[in-house]
Amino acid sequence: MSTLFIADLHLSVQEPAITAGFLHFIQREAIHADALYILGDLFESWIGDDDPEPLYRQVAAALKSLQQQGVPCYFIHGNRDFLLGKRFAEESGMVLLPEENVVELYGRKILILHGDTLCTDDTDYQHFRKKVHNPLIQKLFLWIPLRLRLRIAAYMRNKSQQNNSGKSEHIMDVNSKAVIDAFLRHDVSWMIHGHTHRPAIHSVELPMVTAHRVVLGAWHVEGSMVKVTADNVELITFPF
């Protein structure tokens, strides 16, 4: 009995090996799990559920098949795919969760989230995030013709890469106070997130207990998952 967590696959047509690795993971690992949680950035970008890109239909079919075989799949939006909506969720059989969610697994209460909200030192990004998560701005963007949305998304990705290249590693990592506040706010001693692409298990000292923050790795040259069982919480890398 196990529950699996993944994040930061950044699936795109430009990286077919990662897509193949994900599909293999679904067939080899996820099919045997109690549930699969995807903690954001499943896709490199997402400009709306009406995008006819065949890759998205392929991924949706694989996830739907998983659900039909009795393995539920849950999704928390990332900073790349925050516009993924109900239409794709229904097509893929995924359940959309709030940006911070507590799950109880095998006697543990675990806070799960993408992780970008913990990076509070990156004030430029947090201001940008607040704007693009405005429901009115999202609605206006989705009204724009698909071709123009594609161009806007490409421009924003390039701008983001340029901005990040000039930022320090410290600014782009989580803020310690934000982490502790999240633990205390949700009254948990376990946390799993992605976003930073810095896989590790960290101990965090809270007033009454030592908590654990598990960071998923990105799927660049290998896969990364967290496997939670009754006995253990493991951070695992594996070849595609």
Curated annotation (Swiss-Prot):
Cofactor note: Binds 2 Mn(2+) ions per subunit in a binuclear metal center.
Positions with a binding annotation for Mn(2+) 1: D8, H10, D41, H197
Localisation per UniProt entry: Cell inner membrane
Binding site residues for substrate: N79, R80, D122, S160, N164, K167, H195
One Gene Ontology MF term: manganese ion binding
Catalytic activity field: UDP-2-N,3-O-bis[(3R)-3-hydroxytetradecanoyl]-alpha-D-glucosamine + H2O = 2-N,3-O-bis[(3R)-3-hydroxytetradecanoyl]-alpha-D-glucosaminyl 1-phosphate + UMP + 2 H(+)
A biological-process GO annotation: lipid A biosynthetic process
Domain of life of the native organism: Bacteria
Cofactor: Mn(2+)
NCBIfam families: lipid_A_lpxH, PRK05340.1
Function text: Hydrolyzes the pyrophosphate bond of UDP-2,3-diacylglucosamine to yield 2,3-diacylglucosamine 1-phosphate (lipid X) and UMP by catalyzing the attack of water at the alpha-P atom. Involved in the biosynthesis of lipid A, a phosphorylated glycolipid that anchors the lipopolysaccharide to the outer membrane of the cell.
PANTHER family: UDP-2,3-DIACYLGLUCOSAMINE HYDROLASE, UDP-2,3-DIACYLGLUCOSAMINE HYDROLASE-RELATED
Name of this chain's protein: UDP-2,3-diacylglucosamine hydrolase
Lineage: Bacteria, Pseudomonadati, Pseudomonadota, Gammaproteobacteria, Enterobacterales
